[in-house]
Amino acid sequence: MGSIMDLEESKIIELKNLIKKSKKIVFFGGAGVSTESGILDFRSKDGLYNLKSKYDEPYEVMLSHSYYEENTKTFFEFYKEFMITSAQPNEAHKYLAYLEKSKDLTIITQNIDGLHQEAGSKNVIELHGSIKRNYCTNCGKFYNEKYIKNSKDIPFCETCNGIIKPDVTLYEEPVNEYAFLKARFAIEQADLLIIAGTSLNVYPANSLIYYFYGDNIVLIN
């Protein structure tokens, strides 16, 4: 056990040294970054994929564009129960916010929880959107997640009575092109890429790592 602990400690020291000498850092994070905040990931044994609930459909169906269109009421019932939480930033979020104050750091996240910004990070690229942003599909009026959470059944716009849709990338929907290109540019410019909390199974987000031409990649899982 002592040798394993020594190895872990040495890796931490090595990572700190890499961070110290790097000029442009990209942190590329997935669901595992937020599990310490109590948010379910997707593929672990306790994640959404293996969730046994009152819903008969798997999570990727419940969170698909076609399900949103065809079963809007049930979509929002599921979405409000599992996607909108009272989670708070954990130590990883807080450390990255602290690091941003002294280093040129870009955070690229596949998460939609908005916890990086809550921790204080400014330079965050959200590949799959955020639960914090919701817009009327008719007039475009903005609503926060509390309005969605507190709405009865389907959330409707106070101005025009249109349905409000979360600004998140559902299954069957393309990733926001602007966010993807911005993330690609950040990775192309970086000399240190830190990948954490992701299995790199989700396309096209996983293709971004092929645009890294820097010196060091660190994988934390």
Could you say what each language-model-derived stretch is?
Residues 2-221:
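Conserved catalytic core of sirtuin-type NAD+-dependent deacylases
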